[in-house]
Amino acid sequence: MPSELEKALSNLIDVYHNYSNIQGNHHALYKNDFKKMVTTECPQFVQNINIENLFRELDINSDNAINFEEFLAMVIKVGVASHKDSHKE
């Protein structure tokens, strides 16, 4: 039986593939699909964020797509912000 962390990791992979597979390339999340993903999957996070700038910031190799490693950088940003918010009184 998978642990809670293993389930969470598997869920991250599934979310990434749900959106990257829209264009048929499970290794690349293109801009329109990235926008759809972040507005659907983390609407609170992107309320005050310029999604175009976020995409450019995450696209470290400048190939106009977000690979899984670049996606994880966003997950870390969201996770850190969410953790910080959870400690606000």
From Swiss-Prot:
Pfam families with a match to the protein in the record: S_100
CDD domains noted in UniProt: calgranulins
Residue sites binding Ca(2+) 1 per the record: 33
Record's GO cellular component terms: calprotectin complex; cytosol; extracellular space; intermediate filament cytoskeleton; plasma membrane; S100A8 complex
Database matches in InterPro entries: EF-hand-dom_pair, EF_Hand_1_Ca_BS, EF_hand_dom, S100/CaBP7/8-like_CS, S100_Ca-bd_sub
Annotated knockout phenotype: Death at an early embryonic stage due to embryo resorption, starting about 8 days after fertilization.
Annotated SUPFAM superfamilies: EF-hand
Sites of S-nitrosocysteine modification: 42
Top-level taxon: Eukaryota
GO BP annotations, alphabetical order: apoptotic process; astrocyte development; autophagy; innate immune response; leukocyte migration involved in inflammatory response; neutrophil aggregation; neutrophil chemotaxis; peptide secretion
Gene Ontology molecular function, alphabetical: antioxidant activity; calcium ion binding
UniProt topology in membrane: Peripheral membrane protein
Residues where Ca(2+) 2 binds: 59, 61, 63, 70
Domain EF-hand: 13-48, 46-81
Entry keyword annotation includes Cytoplasm: yes
Stated regulation of activity: Calprotectin (S100A8/A9) activity on TLR4 signaling is inhibited by paquinimod.
Binding sites annotated in the UniProt record for Zn(2+): 17, 27, 83
Function: S100A8 is a calcium- and zinc-binding protein which plays a prominent role in the regulation of inflammatory processes and immune response. It can induce neutrophil chemotaxis and adhesion. Predominantly found as calprotectin (S100A8/A9) which has a wide plethora of intra- and extracellular functions. The intracellular functions include: facilitating leukocyte arachidonic acid trafficking and metabolism, modulation of the tubulin-dependent cytoskeleton during migration of phagocytes and activation of the neutrophilic NADPH-oxidase. (Microbial infection) Upon infection by murine coronavirus (MHV-A59), induces expansion of aberrant immature neutrophils in a TLR4-dependent manner.
Protein name from the UniProt record: Protein S100-A8
Gene: S100a8
